[in-house]
Amino acid sequence: MSVRLGIVMDPIARINFKKDSSLAMLLAAQARGWSLFYMEQQDLYQKAGVARGRMRPLKVFNDASRWFELEAESDQPLHELDVILMRKDPPFDNEFVYSTYLLEQAERAGALVVNRPQSLRDCNEKFFATQFTQCTPPTMVSRRSDILREFAAEHRDIILKPLDGMGGSSIFRHREGDPNLSVILETLTQHGSQQIMAQRYLPEIKDGDKRILMIDGEPVPYCLARIPAQGETRGNLAAGGRGVAQPLSERDRWIAAEVGPHLRERGLLFVGLDVIGDYLTEINVTSPTCIREIDQAFDTRIGDKLMDAIAAQLAAR
């Protein structure tokens, strides 16, 4: 099967070779003989109603000293690619939204876009999880300090975080009696002008914030537990957490079964569920990571499984 695969990502020269999931995907695609084409967000544009890209043929290598090679740039309609991986990291800003508009045009013209552009817009990574109340801890979203204070008083120990953060940035823990609630709320809500999320604190975070990877609605059988550094409440690797790969628990599988059909329905082919203890806390749809860490521990070949799912979708068209 001859496949032309494009990727939209952050600069490939600056990725973390050991941990980058996009590189794992590209290596798996190239191993199948698929042709790779590299783009950054700035390379997408529209002309005469056609979404186009300034793209460069790409080769990738499993070599920490030289992991990519780019050829000369060409200008092509995006729909001439069979599949496009949208792997641009947050922030989820206007430029990200505009990129989804362009990718959606390519999708309408025949390209498979992973993940579906409309769902990237619709499924905020924190807010989307609130659709699954059977899986989540007590949670609320508000920008009013009085409503948030009521939640804090009810649960006594809570986490407060922005709806658009990543990597554990701007996450605060508030405990009953802490005098800093006012400044936390002012900072996160920007003085009542921005919605934020509050969740009951889960002490199970000490055992790790688990990243469960989902491929076409089905879980990879192993996850990465991201264990907080000493004195931290955030397990994110970007915040200094330590990753430990482990098999899924029965509760993890139950959560995946609750969420999976909705992901498949929305064209969310590759997703990361964040689970603390028995509770779903976030659903990461934009650029989920942790492929390489899990692969290294259990030889799961997650990139291959994702390419299998993509090939199946292309064959079904």
Swiss-Prot record:
Coiled-coil ranges per UniProt: none
EC number: 6.3.2.3
Cofactor: Mg(2+); Mn(2+)
Root EC class: ligase
Gene3D superfamilies: 3.40.50.20, ATP-grasp fold, A domain, ATP-grasp fold, B domain
Catalytic activity as recorded in UniProt: gamma-L-glutamyl-L-cysteine + glycine + ATP = glutathione + ADP + phosphate + H(+)
UniProt-listed PROSITE patterns: ATP_GRASP (PS50975)
Gene Ontology terms: cellular component: cytoplasm
Residues that, per the record, bind Mg(2+): 282, 284
Residues bound to ATP: 152-208
One term of GO molecular function: glutathione synthase activity
Keyword hit for 4Fe-4S: no
Keyword 4Fe-4S: no
Pathway: Sulfur metabolism; glutathione biosynthesis; glutathione from L-cysteine and L-glutamate: step 2/2
Alphabetical keyword list: ATP-binding, Glutathione biosynthesis, Ligase, Magnesium, Manganese, Metal-binding, Nucleotide-binding
Cofactor info, note text: Binds 1 Mg(2+) or Mn(2+) ion per subunit.
ATP-grasp domain residues: 126-311
NCBIfam families referenced in this protein's UniProt entry, alphabetically: glut_syn, PRK05246.1
Family in the record: Belongs to the prokaryotic GSH synthase family.
Protein name as it appears in the record: Glutathione synthetase
Annotated organism of origin: Pseudomonas aeruginosa (strain ATCC 15692 / DSM 22644 / CIP 104116 / JCM 14847 / LMG 12228 / 1C / PRS 101 / PAO1)
UniProt gene name: gshB
